[in-house]
Each structure stands twice: as C-alpha cells, then as structure tokens.
Amino acid sequence: IGNTLYAHELNGDDAAIFKSGTNNVVKNNYPMSTDIIIDVNNAWIGKEAVIGITLNSAATGTANIMVGGKTYTVNLTDGKATLKVSDLPAGENTVKVDYDGDGKFKSSTNSTTFKVFDGIVTNETFFDYFINGTLADYVPEGATLDFRGKFYSHDDVKFDLVINKPINMISTTGDAFIDLNTTAGSLLGENPGSCFTINNGGSGSNVSGIIFHNTQVWIYDAHNVVLNNISVIVENKRVGSGVGTTAIRHGSTNVTLKNSYIYTSNNGGSSSIVLTHVQNCTVENNTIVGEGNVGNLLYLNTFNDAGCDLSNDYNKIINNKITGPSPAAGICYGIGINGNNNLIAGNVINYAGNGIVPAWGATPNNNTYCDNVLIGGASMSVAASSIAYNNTVSGTLTIGSGSVAYNNTAKAISVSSNSVVSNSSATAALTVQAGAKVANVTAASLSVSGKNAVIENVSISGVGTIKSSATNTTLINSTFGGMLTVQSAKNTIKYNNIVLATGDAAILATGGDNVITNNYLIAGDKLGDNAVNSTVETNIVKDNLPGGIVNVTITAKDVFEGSDVIIDVTVDSLSNLTEKFMLKINNKEYVL
C-alpha cells in the first residue's frame, strides 16, 4: 500500500505479483489507474460542442482530446478539463481522450460519440430534434429546421410537435407533409387533440412551405409569429371543434398568416381560421375554402378561451379569397367579426350566405370595411360606428348604427339608425331607419321606417314609402320613377321630381301635418299640386310644379316685302303665367 512500483512494463498495483499466499492486500500503489469520464451532449452545427473530461481529482498534467480530425491539449485542474469546439461536421462525431499519466497515475484512454445536428428533419431524425414533443435543448434559438418528407402520426409512432423556442421551420424540398391525425374532443375546445403548437416560448418563429393535413394548428399566447405559404387541409375529420382548425388565440399578438391555403371539408361544423382574444394579427392573401358541413371560414371569436379577456382589436383581414360551401349554411359565415378597430379590406368572397357579418352575439365597433367584393349572393353587415367604402356586395349591404358608408354598390342597402350613407347604389331596395342621413344614392325602391331621417339627392327608379313610424323625415332633391307614399306625419318633402306616365297621383299622403312643396310632379294628366292625393286636411300642399299645360298659338298674315307684319301670340295655361316669352324670327329674338 502506498508504494511506488515499476517493473518493466508494469507499474503501480500491477507491479505487485504474489506467487503464493492468501489475504494479500494490494492498493494505492503509484502510479494508480484512473478512469476517464467524458461528458458531451449533442450539439448544433456551427455552435459549440462542450466536451468535459473527469479523472481522479488528484490527477495532474495534461490530456489530449481528439475530435473532428484535430487534437487539443488541455490542462487538468482537480482532475478536470473542458474543451469547447464549434467547427464540427454534421453527423456522428467521435471524441477520444488520452491521458499520459503523471507520477501518481498511469496513462489511460477513453472515447465516446455524440451527434452534431444540421436541422434536416425527416421521419427518421424527428426524435433527434423533438424530445417528448418539444424542441431539444441543443436546438438553439433562431435555428432553421428543414422538414422533408411525410410525417404520419399513428398508434406506433406519434409525432408531437411543439415549437417552444423561436425557430425557422421550412421545407427546402417542398414536400413536408405533416399529419398528426388530430381528433378533437369536446365541442367547447378544451381538448383540441394532437396539435402543431407554437406557444409563448416559440414567439418570434417563422413557418413556411409546410403542408398540415388533418392537423390542428394551434398558436397559443405567442407573439411575432409568421405563417407563410403553408397549407392546412382538413378532410372528413373532426378537427377544430370549438377553436377552429387554424387557431390563433389566448392573447397572441402580431401573428401573421399569409399566402396560404386553408381548406376545410366536413369537419363536424367547426370553423377554419379563428382568431380568439388576439390583437395586431394579420390574415392576408390567403385562399380559404369550405365545403360540406363546416363552420365559419374566418372568424374573430371570443368563446372557449378561459382565462383571457383580451378583446379582438387592431387586426387586419386583407386580400383573402374565400369560397363558402354550397348550399349556404346558417353556421357558416365568410368572415365573422367580433372586436374593435379591425380592418377588413380587399377580400373576395364567393358565397350565397352571410359574407361579412358581426359574429353571433357580438357587438363589434369602429371597424373599417373597404374594397371587398362579395359575389354569389353574399351579404355584408357593417358593425356599429364603423366605416365602409368601395365595397361591392351581390346581396344586401347593411350599414350598422352610427356608421359612415360611401361609394358602395349592392343588391340592396339597409341603412341603420344614425348612420350616414352617400354616393352608393343598389339594384333593389334602399331602406332607411331612424336618424339616418342618405345622400346621392340610387336604388330601385325606397322605404323609410324610422323617424328623423334625412334623405337627399336619391334616385329611385320605382316607388318610395315613408312608413307610419317614420315621422319628421326630410326628403329633398330626389327623383322617383314610381309613386311616393307618405304614411307618417310631420315630414318635409321638397324639390323632388316624380313624373309618372299614368296614374292619379305622384304622391299619396295618408299622414298629417306634412309639408309637400316645390316638387315637380306629374301623374298622367295630373300636374303639380293636383298630382298630390292628400287624405288629411292638415297637410300643406302648395307651389308644386308644373302649374299646368302651356299651349302657345302663333298666327301671322302674308304682307308685301318691306311692309310690317303683325304676329299674334296666344298663350293658354291652367294657371296664370307671369313670366316673359321669347319669340325668335329669322334668328332675331323679341321679348314679349
């Protein structure tokens, strides 16, 4: 014990050899043996691989570490040393450690292997990058993961995918196809099933060029995320129940979904793209298609997100192409809106149902709707206190209370209370509610149903009706191709033009205390005031034109050249005329 022993090639304990005897003790003779423990984790290409070696704490001197085709000499401190190497090739690397020994310890050697990953993810390398569904520790922030080929989850192999740090997810081969075989649980959304998830830790991530099939896409409390040129295809599978197949939710901000294809078919009636309690998010230039039993195609939602009360504000839904199912379904909106100060612009919706409307039970405000085109009969309802302009709507355009709308075209326009509508046209009805202001609008018919409305410079090809509830209506400077019926009281009707080839009245007034003056009215042979059929004596009907038919007769006798000629002009009218006439003879004018 404790001797220094050398014998030829033997040393330390190995140099003590007993030919006979029992119970001999041989230990701690110098130089002693020491194991080399190598500690190295898998590394990311271009990043440092940290290699730690541990010998007996009393070992001194140096050790040689061979890795990546190079040899590095390190000094031992308390029997330990650490080497950081960053220029290692991708794949499996071998690290070998040689210790030359010192006076106390003999030489020894050991080796092990570790991997350097380059971010190429296949169904064979997937579990190198995702440990228990989340990114491995050695995948650094900002890494690029290049997904290649198909990833099918099934009973034997389950590809859980949670992005919990900021990375870039791409497919250079263009064939990344991820099917997590999602089956949603409750319709209330608390069990969305297997998901592709970007959580708060994954904020700052970018995903592009990936196809997700029958897979819940779940962006949860994440920020500054971009989903670009992805496909989310759900076919005949219960995906998105209560949350939407592509769900951006729970306080997420600055998330962008753009240039992507979202297709949903028969998923049990759930929505496609759903933004729930999010702000400053953008859904732009996507193609969104729904077929069969599907829910809303794009939806700003507030349901099924416990623990978050952030309102859906300052989001942008722009330049998307949306096609709804045929036939239309009551549970499917093209775009459903809940929240404030959102921009809905440049979208094209082909659908026979509700194209752009407030979400069920929602009271959104202060949103902007512009440059949207709705075809196929789709309707559009503008939220209260909002702005709508340059929209083309093949169905009914409803302007919410307190809103401002201009330069819109629709099949029919419904103007809610206290809103302002101008410079627009409808091929069918224009309906106006209380306190609304309407100017420079064309339509096939007019119906006013609320009090205190102001309507001017409208052009109506057919009839107009001021209903019994529409008191104190002001109608001025407008044109009608059919009769105007005034059923309510205390209205002002001035400077309008109604010319009817047939009939007994241009205006039928059944309410009282109306002022009907200075209009141009013709109904068959009824002119001016005579073209007003007032059934109530309290109406004021006067100064309506024309006053009557004017017949002018001109006679003159032949005379010799150079002599004066006498020309007789006779004017017949149903009323007394006070204005002057002009007589023109051989291009010379005479005032009579």
Regions found by a protein language model. Name each.
Residues D14-I17, K158-D160, G193-T197, Q216-W218, ...:
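Structural detector of coil-to-beta-strand junctions
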Residues S153-I170, I178-V225, K237-S252, V274-V278, ...:
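Extracellular beta-strand-rich solenoid/capping regions of secreted or surface-exposed proteins
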